[in-house]
Amino acid sequence: MSQETGRADAAFCADLARTRDFRTYAASLFVPPETRRAWIAIAAFNAEVSYVRDHVSQPLPGEIRLQWWRDVLTGEGQGSRGEAEANPVAAELLLAITRYDLPVETFVRLIDAHVFDVYDDPMPDMAALEAHCHDTSAAMYALRAKVLGASSSDVSRVADHAGIAEGLTDVMLALPRHAARRQLYLPGDLMSLQGVIAEEVFLQQGNASLKDALTQLRREARSQLEQALAMLANAPSTASLAFLPLAVIGKVLTRLESSEPFAPPTLSRLGILWATWRAASATPFRA
């Protein structure tokens, strides 16, 4: 790969991350410059895989796209590593994996978790939703931490709490989008407990039962966030940088308290940058 191609690939990934995951992109501005390219590559990959459902109308094309990514990472099948050089996100991701010795199996588990996205199966229960968060959002935190040189068992536990907090928050933020395509990430046991009817969610009826379920989900997200922050209070600053997106999660959870289910809050890019800068400047870490 030429230097010119490498710069073009990195710029493509930065634009993709900035467009689809500004929360992580903003955090990347405050990490050591030499690690930023890998952060962006990971974020761009996550955006590609997370948005597969948005680009397909049937499960099979989504499965094929996800399998291509598996093949790229393992060097097997149609998505060989040679072919990957033609894809800027794949090329940048493979560079990051090689440079920072990132575990391929973590990326593969993330891809496997996103197979759920291309179908309309209900999320069975809270345990299944938390497992999904573990393999997606928590995995992203752990990978970013490893790029920064922080990969201890303590960091892994923080990543678990942070990932669940972020994942549950994103489920609430994405409720209108999911409901519009008759897809539910709300856990089935919580829906049953609160008397939430799936068809009413699909019709975007924000009734009391749904609000009660979301309140409980929000409390769990807040609890997970607080546990992550408590553990970060004594963590090295290098490790804390991996969790900068939590500053935004805290703000969103607060706004969700006064929002309607199908009119979730939004933070401006300036607001995201401000919250991230404050967290990056704080000692110890706070969100």
Task: Please provide the spans of the model-predicted regions.
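Catalytic cores of Mg2+-dependent Asp-rich isoprenoid enzymes
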Residues: 1-96, 100-111, 133-142, 154-168, ...
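Alpha-helical transmembrane segments of multipass membrane proteins
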Residues: 143-147
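Acidic/His metal-coordination segments adjacent to aromatic residues that form catalytic metal sites
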Residues: 115-128, 206
